Each structure stands twice: as C-alpha cells, then as structure tokens.
C-alpha cells in the first residue's frame, strides 16, 4: 500500500496572534463552539493519552463532559486501564482533532479525581441505559464473549426497572488541570499556524511555534 501521495491543501485560512483570546480556555471554548456550530461529528471527542508504570503510552477516545476555568472533565470506570495509569502517573495529555475545520488542540496537564458530589450529579443526569451500562461493564477486564456483557446488562435492567440506580463506587470522573494548550490551524503550503499557551503561576504566556 503506497500512502505517499495521500495529501491535501489546507484552505480555511490562518491563525494570527491578534485573533487569540488572552485566556486559552476562552480560546478553546471559542473553537469548540465553532466545531459544534459546524455540525462536526462528535465535536467533544478527545484522545486521552496516559502512561503505564513501564513508560508504555496508551491512547483512547473519550468524550469531554465539562470545561471551565479549572480544567477539562471526563468520566470513566475507576478500575479501567486509564484510571490505573493515572493512579501511577497523573500527568496526562488530551487531543481534539477537528479535521473538517483544519484544526487541532493539544493539552497537557495533571489529572485529579472529582468529588463524590460531582460524580453523583453527572451520573444522575445520564440516561438510565447509560447508568446500567456503567455498572454492567468492568472496563478493560477480559470477558469470554459479548453475551456475558449483554446478559449482565439485561439482569441489571430488570433489577432496576422501577427504581433509581445508585452511583457505583468504581465509577467517577477526572478533571485535567491544564499546564499547556497548543492551538493548530492548517495553512497553505504546509505553513501551519501553531500557538502554545504555557501556564506561569496564575498567568499564561503565548508563543508561536514553527510548523
């Protein structure tokens, strides 16, 4: 398979320093809203990268569930591989690929667990089917067949048919406190625009990077 000729030109225009927000969270929210307004598929989907105790990196796609001045939030099974990695090394990176807009955002930061109240508030807002699925699946554990998972789901669906589903102790969220955010905009002739926000105490510095 020859992939050498698969390429395209970037046509959506550049990114200039004068167009940037002073706060990178504001810049992120601006781009995220534009991705939503453009009807991109899964605009909140992000790659989460972690590292195990041997230094082996792993990536997976999860959905961003909140962003504010403190950080970026996602939820997962606390027994999952990513949660085990975070327990060992809470440095993490996130990546948002908004290909149709010729944009991407790369974030580095530190993960911290959400409070029980934050977990409960979000869990109770989920559809009941999603709540059941969170309990039925012990994420990253080995199972013999899909039928085992489906059987557990149906069992729990019947069990909680007429009542509230308690928040499982092995489920919760993380907030990523950002230390850097890089905004990438595709440019003509591969002269892409890259701006890196780096946290300095309570302030942010902004540097242009070569493509």
From Swiss-Prot:
Binding, FMN: 60-65, 75-76, 81-82, 104, 139-140, 184, 194
Flavoprotein recorded as keyword: yes
Keyword flag Oxidoreductase: yes
Enzyme class per UniProt: oxidoreductase
Catalysis: reaction(s): pyridoxamine 5'-phosphate + O2 + H2O = pyridoxal 5'-phosphate + H2O2 + NH4(+); pyridoxine 5'-phosphate + O2 = pyridoxal 5'-phosphate + H2O2
Keyword vocabulary terms for this entry: Flavoprotein, FMN, Oxidoreductase, Pyridoxine biosynthesis
Residues reported to bind substrate: 7-10, 65, 122, 126, 130, 190-192
Cofactor: FMN
Stated family: Belongs to the pyridoxamine 5'-phosphate oxidase family.
Role this protein plays: Catalyzes the oxidation of either pyridoxine 5'-phosphate (PNP) or pyridoxamine 5'-phosphate (PMP) into pyridoxal 5'-phosphate (PLP).
Quaternary structure annotation from Swiss-Prot or TrEMBL: Homodimer.
Listed name of the protein: Pyridoxine/pyridoxamine 5'-phosphate oxidase
Organism of provenance: Vibrio cholerae serotype O1 (strain ATCC 39541 / Classical Ogawa 395 / O395)
UniProt gene name: pdxH
């Amino acid at each position: 398979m020859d992939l050498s000729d698969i390429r395209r030109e970037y046509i959506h225009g550049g990114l200039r320093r004068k167009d940037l927000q002073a706060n990178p969270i504001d810049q992120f929210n601006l781009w995220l809203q534009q991705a939503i307004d453009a009807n991109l598929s899964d605009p909140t989907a992000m790659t989460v990268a972690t590292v195990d105790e041997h230094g082996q990196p792993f990536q997976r796609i999860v959905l961003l569930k909140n962003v504010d001045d403190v950080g970026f939030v996602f939820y997962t099974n606390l027994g999952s591989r990513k949660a085990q990695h975070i327990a060992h090394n809470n440095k993490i990176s996130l990546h948002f690929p908004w290909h149709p807009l010729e944009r991407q955002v790369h974030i580095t930061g530190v993960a911290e667990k959400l409070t029980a109240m934050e977990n409960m508030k979000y869990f109770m807002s989920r559809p009941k089917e999603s709540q059941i699925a969170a309990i039925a699946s012990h994420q990253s554990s080995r199972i013999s067949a899909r039928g085992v998972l489906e059987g557990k789901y149906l069992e729990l669906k019947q069990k909680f048919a007429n009542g509230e589903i308690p928040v499982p102790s092995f489920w919760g969220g993380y907030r990523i406190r950002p230390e850097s955010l890089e905004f990438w905009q595709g440019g003509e002739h591969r002269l892409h625009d890259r701006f890196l926000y780096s946290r300095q105490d309570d302030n942010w510095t902004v540097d242009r990077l070569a493509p």
